[in-house]
């Protein structure tokens, strides 16, 4: 668990910070907050990596990472006087399930081309549901901290 896990975590965080920075640039984020977007993308992906490494499935790990991204984004928005979405949207994009969605789409095309088979339908449904649950976990996890931290009325 020692050095190889730490190296894999560092590599995962750096490789997740690159697309977070790229999407922040596409979204025209102010220059002074670009490093924070990259850092938050790396931290969120690193938390998801560690949660998956220690046995959590990818849907719940994505949910946990999205909650952390939302909390940190709200905190940084107060310090840097920017909207929380400036930090959080670009940071959560590297966690979107591209491979699962692509595999589901390819399975749909193969079903359309080759006809129905139970194996193709199983692959399509498995990957479609996995991608849907991850996207749902990311969107709900990203919105929960705002609901918790900006609530004006008591919960009960």
Curated annotation (Swiss-Prot):
InterPro entries reported in the protein's UniProt record: ThrE_2 (IPR024528), ThrE_Dicarb/AminoAcid_Exp (IPR050539), YjjB (IPR020914)
Keywords in alphabetical order: Cell inner membrane, Cell membrane, Membrane, Transmembrane, Transmembrane helix, Transport
TM region positions: 7-27, 54-74, 86-106, 128-148
Record keyword Oxidoreductase present: no
Top-rank taxon, per record: Bacteria
Subcellular location: Cell inner membrane
Membrane topology: Multi-pass membrane protein
Stated role: Involved in succinate export with YjjP. Both proteins are required for export.
Family assignment from sequence similarity: Belongs to the ThrE exporter (TC 2.A.79) family.
Subunit record text: The transporter is composed of YjjB and YjjP.
Protein name: Probable succinate transporter subunit YjjB
């Amino acid at each position: 668990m020692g050095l190889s896990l730490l190296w894999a975590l560092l590599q995962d965080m750096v490789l997740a910070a690159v697309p977070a920075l790229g999407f922040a640039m596409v979204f025209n984020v102010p220059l002074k907050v670009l490093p924070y977007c990259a850092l938050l993308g790396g931290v969120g992906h690193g938390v998801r990596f560690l949660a998956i490494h220690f046995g959590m499935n990818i849907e719940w790990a994505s949910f946990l990472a999205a909650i952390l991204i939302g909390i940190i984004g709200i905190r940084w928005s107060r310090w840097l006087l920017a909207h929380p979405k400036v930090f959080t949207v670009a940071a959560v994009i590297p966690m979107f399930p591209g491979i699962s969605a692509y595999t589901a789409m390819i399975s749909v095309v193969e079903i359309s081309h080759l006809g129905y088979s139970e194996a193709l339908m199983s692959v399509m449904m498995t990957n479609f549901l996995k991608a849907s649950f991850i996207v749902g976990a990311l969107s709900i996890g990203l919105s929960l901290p705002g609901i918790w931290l900006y609530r004006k009325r008591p919960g009960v």
